[in-house]
């Protein structure tokens, strides 16, 4: 949303610059229409590029990241987004209400960690286990379960495998909750501090 806002602001600013410089060149400096348009376009483009560059610089400064770090985090976020699409697809292939609810809960937590990191990229370092391990395991096992459960005839071995997969997914749901807690670490600490302060003031 913030990126779209910056794009909109600098698009409007560069358009206004194009019109102003174009008119100034044509009427004020007696340039030809062609040159006036060229000067206007060049000025508008320069304003737009400078504005976007400055917005990015301020964003990186705010989150205390280098350009290389942010590019790396964006790459991981894009990979996570693609895995979320796979997880959502597997969600609707669940054959039981119980598995549908469990998959929906996992997707909810995954999405929350993803959005939290997208909003505040530096949180990526607090949720590295999620991006490097947990998410992959969740997606692969959920897809595996969806595939195996689609078999019309289930042997004893297949039923056991499905049962083991359900148990593992339950454990992974708990790990996702831990990853979310880790990603929200400072917010939880701040909330606890505020709660302690409120309790202390009530005792007075």
From Swiss-Prot:
Taxonomic superkingdom: Bacteria
Keywords for this protein: Hydrolase
GO molecular function, one term: hydrolase activity
Pfam families assigned: Halogen_Hydrol (PF10112)
Gene of this entry: xpaC
Function of the protein: In double copy it causes aberrant cell morphology, filamentation and inhibits sporulation. Hydrolyzes 5-bromo-4-chloroindolyl phosphate.
Organism listed in the record: Bacillus subtilis (strain 168)
Protein name, per record: Protein XpaC
């Amino acid at each position: 949303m913030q990126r779209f806002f910056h794009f909109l602001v600098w698009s409007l600013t560069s358009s206004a610059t194009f019109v102003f410089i174009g008119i100034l060149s044509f009427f004020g400096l007696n340039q030809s229409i062609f040159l006036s348009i060229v000067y206007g376009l060049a000025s508008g483009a320069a304003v737009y590029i400078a504005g976007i560059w400055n917005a990015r610089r301020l964003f990186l400064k705010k989150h205390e990241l280098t350009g290389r770090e942010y590019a790396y985090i964006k790459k991981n976020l894009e990979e996570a987004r693609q895995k979320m699409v796979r997880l959502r697809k597997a969600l609707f292939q669940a054959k039981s209400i119980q598995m549908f609810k469990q998959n929906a809960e996992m997707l909810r937590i995954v999405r929350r960690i993803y959005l939290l990191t997208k909003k505040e990229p530096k949180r990526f370092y607090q949720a590295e286990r999620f991006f490097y391990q947990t998410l992959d395991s969740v997606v692969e096992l959920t897809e595996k379960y969806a595939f195996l459960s689609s078999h019309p005839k289930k042997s004893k071995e297949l039923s056991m495998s499905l049962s083991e997969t359900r148990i593992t997914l339950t454990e992974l749901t708990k790990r996702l909750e831990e990853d979310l807690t880790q990603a929200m670490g400072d917010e939880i600490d701040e909330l606890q501090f505020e709660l302690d302060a409120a309790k202390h003031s009530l005792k007075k």
